[in-house]
Amino acid sequence: MHRIDETFRRLRAQSRKALIPFITAGDPSLEAAVPVMHALVRAGADVIELGVPFSDPMADGPVIQHSSERALQRGVGLAYVLQTVDVFRQSDAVTPVVLMGYLNPLEIYGIARFTQQALASGVDGVLLVDLPPEEADEIRAIFSAAGLALIVLASPTTSASRLATLSGVAQGYLYYVSFAGVTGADRLDAQSAGDRLRGLRAQTQVPVVVGFGIRDAASAVVMAVDADGVVVGSALVTALSDAPDVDTACRRADAFLAPLRQALDAVK
């Protein structure tokens, strides 16, 4: 968790916005995961969200669903995901890594076992898209004791009372979903999202980042104005999806992310 906090402190001191790319572990190939993570850091990533493949990713659109399916067909599970982070940490002890996925794989793996191994691998936070509120406190306590941040989601349909609760318990950063729907959709409402983001930032002690629908430098800049950072997922996953080899995947990661980094650095 400390890596997330330190990263946002540094960015705030520099008046810079966080750039948070999402990739699916094991896609476009098992061999490409760690090299692509390093390529993203070189291109300007501040935090990496690493997707844990799941057979029923209900919050994800077709792009990430298919990416998850491809990874599952390659045999990717939590053990591979944690090993990927462990290998990444051998040459990058600074960049925060947040695992993003669903509760079921963790329950099957065992929450306590997962927590212990995630900490040992160098994971900094976990975002569980479908975590029921009634289970969140117990898992948050387990994660917190190990130094893992439980990243929470808020959306346009989240009630005011629920937002107040989330703002009080958020760790690492709060992830605001820019619209109600699935990942990869293209219907940003910058004004509405901006109003909500300003309100969230005023009532929570952690940074607020925004995702869903961000696909290029222009959309990243529009959404970053009222946020502490932006998450880009489906568009990046698409760019990587058919990379024939590791080198191509790394070049595509750099070519996709570098323009977003340059554009965000102009936003104050």
Curated annotation (Swiss-Prot):
EC number, UniProt record: 4.2.1.20
Pfam families, A to Z: Trp_syntA
Known catalytic reactions: (1S,2R)-1-C-(indol-3-yl)glycerol 3-phosphate + L-serine = D-glyceraldehyde 3-phosphate + L-tryptophan + H2O
Primary enzyme class: lyase
CDD domains, A to Z: Tryptophan_synthase_alpha
InterPro entries documented for this protein: Aldolase_TIM (IPR013785), RibuloseP-bd_barrel (IPR011060), Trp_synthase_alpha_AS (IPR018204), Trp_synthase_suA (IPR002028)
SUPFAM superfamilies for the chain: Ribulose-phoshate binding barrel
Active-site residues from the entry: 49, 60
The protein's role, per its UniProt record: The alpha subunit is responsible for the aldol cleavage of indoleglycerol phosphate to indole and glyceraldehyde 3-phosphate.
Name used for this protein in its record: Tryptophan synthase alpha chain
Originating organism: Xylella fastidiosa (strain Temecula1 / ATCC 700964)
Lineage, uppermost ranks: Bacteria, Pseudomonadati, Pseudomonadota, Gammaproteobacteria, Lysobacterales
